[in-house]
Amino acid sequence: MNFGDITVVIVTFKSEHKIYSCIDSIPEESKIIIIENSNDTKFKQKIEAHRSNVECFLTMQNNGYAAGNNFGLKKVKTKFALVLNPDTRLLKNSLKEFYNTAAKNNDFWLIGPNQDFVNNVQNENTLEVDNIKGY
C-alpha cells in the first residue's frame, strides 16, 4: 500500500480553527490540497508551513463547496483522490481501508465512508443508483 497514491482535497472557508486536527490525521506520505475560499494569505502561509505535504490555493472569493472541490480535484496528480471537510478526522485505518477498496475495484467513480457520529453510532445506509440525474 502506498499512501503517496492518494491526494486529499479539503475545501474550506475561514476554518483555520478546525482544519489542523484534520490535516494531522492524514499520513505525511499523502499529498494534501487545500482550497481556501478567500484571499487569506496568512492562512495559506501558516497551513503550508504546518506540514510539508500541504499545498493551499486561495480562490480570492467564496465560490462555494462544489466549485472548490472541482478546482481542487483538477489539481490532483495521484491515482486516487479523497475529499474531506475541514472538521473531519481520519481514524487510524481509514486511509488504508480507502486505498485497499479503491485499488481492488476498478469500476467505481465514487466511494463513500461510514460516518461515526456522537457515541460512535454509525450510519450504514446505502443507496445504489444507476444514474445520479435528479439526486
Please state what every model-predicted region is.
Residues T12-E28:
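Short, well-formed alpha-helical segments that are part of the catalytic scaffolds
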Residues N93-N125:
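Conserved donor NDP-sugar-binding/catalytic core segment of glycosyltransferases
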